[in-house]
């Protein structure tokens, strides 16, 4: 079991979640169902939580793959 992870590994995981989140937004636009809306919202909540925790730990979210406007796709419908 890995007790610690390096920053690159954490960045890779976060970037993957961001990618899946943006895909969920596209799915919601193509097929606006309550499931797809809920899925996109869930990704936003996860990413927002991680972003906030990074800031609390005095880490720059950009160093972990967050673009400056990472929230914009969630709110530009």
Task: Label each PLM-derived region with a short phrase.
Residues 1-37:
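N-terminal acidic leader/helix
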Residues 13-23, 57-77:
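Extended, charge-rich alpha-helical interface modules
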Residues 28, 49-52, 72-74:
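Amphipathic alpha-helical interaction segments
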């Amino acid at each position: 079991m890995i007790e610690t992870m390096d920053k690159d590994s954490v960045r890779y995981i976060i970037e993957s979640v961001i990618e899946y989140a943006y895909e969920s937004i596209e799915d919601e636009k193509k097929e606006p169902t309550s499931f797809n809306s809920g899925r996109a919202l869930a990704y936003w909540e996860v990413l927002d939580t991680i972003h906030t925790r990074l800031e609390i730990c005095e880490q720059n979210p950009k160093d972990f793959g967050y673009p400056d406007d990472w929230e914009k796709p969630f709110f530009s419908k």
